[in-house]
Regions:
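C-terminal membrane-anchoring or membrane-association module
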Residues: 225-239
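Hydrophobic alpha-helix-in-membranes signature
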Residues: 7, 209-211
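Sec/Tat signal peptide C-region and signal peptidase I cleavage site
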Residues: 19-26
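Bacterial N-terminal signal peptides
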Residues: 10-18
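A short, hydrophobic C-terminal helix/tail in secreted or cell-surface proteins
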Residues: 211-228
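Mature extracellular "passenger" or substrate-interacting domains of secreted, surface-exposed proteins
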Residues: 26-208
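Bacterial N-terminal signal peptides that target proteins for export
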Residues: 2-10, 230
Length: 239
């Protein structure tokens, strides 16, 4: 049975109340459940080497075929990482963050680039990784909310109005609201990537990152396999 999520969220609320004093507005609470099901490609629990970041890609669309371009187009809103127990706590398997947008559209997070301006309505992604470099052993999960509607305890993952004059304006971007996998898996669905295990239940699973160029080869191989299987089934069905 899972431990209630109230404690981490109360901690986030306390941080938010402190941060929203002054010129900041449009606070976002984001993260996972306490004692969540977070795994790597082998089915092992994610360890303290992982980080969890929320951000946008501007006008760039991330796909499995252009993984080598993600880092160059990534704009960080906030990051949760170890050893901050209220960021990424690998022992209790939860990550949590609270971040406010400034009226000019920049993020108040110390992990964000102060030059990055986030346009209202921009799609927000969650990127989990043990390294943003594509090297042997790198594992990623990149997921987002495809429905863009309130549900599963989460608000739509889109940048709110940073100039909202209400100091109590807030949004909740929780992992439970993720429904699209660019790489890795979320909420029981494995997306693109290489895995050696499939957990019975998972909220997030990272996948091995393909080396540049290999993603197209993998997709081509998969397409060829499906074509051969289709031809074989067609021959078997003929009298």
């Amino acid at each position: 049975m899972k431990t209630p999520t109230f404690l981490p969220r109360l901690l986030c609320l306390a941080l938010a109340l402190a941060w929203t004093q002054g010129s900041q507005a449009s606070t976002v609470f984001w993260g996972s459940q306490f004692n969540d099901n977070l795994f790597n490609s082998t089915g092992a629990a994610l360890d303290s080497t992982y980080s969890f970041a929320i951000g946008t890609f501007g006008g760039f669309t991330p796909t499995y075929q252009n993984v080598d371009q993600w880092a160059a187009n990534w704009h960080v809103i906030d990051i949760a990482f170890a050893p901050d127990v209220n960021g990424w706590n690998s022992t209790d398997q939860f990550f949590a963050g609270t971040v406010a947008f400034n009226p000019d559209g920049t993020s108040a997070s110390p992990d964000a680039n102060p030059a990055d301006v986030f346009a209202q309505g921009s799609l927000v992604y969650l990127w989990a990784y043990n390294s943003q470099d594509i090297v042997p052993g790198s594992e990623w999960a990149l997921v987002r909310d495809a429905s863009l509607t309130t549900g599963n305890g989460s608000d739509p993952w889109i940048v709110p109005d940073p100039a909202n004059p209400d100091p109590n304006a807030s949004s909740n971007w929780y992992l439970s609201g993720a429904s699209t996998e660019i790489i890795g898996g979320t909420n029981g669905v494995q997306g693109a990537g290489t895995y050696t295990a499939t957990p019975g239940v998972f909220s997030l699973q990272t996948a091995v990152v393909p080396e540049p160029g290999s993603a197209m080869l993998l997709l081509a191989a998969a397409a060829a396999h499906l074509a051969r299987r289709s031809r074989r089934l067609t021959r078997m069905s003929q009298p």
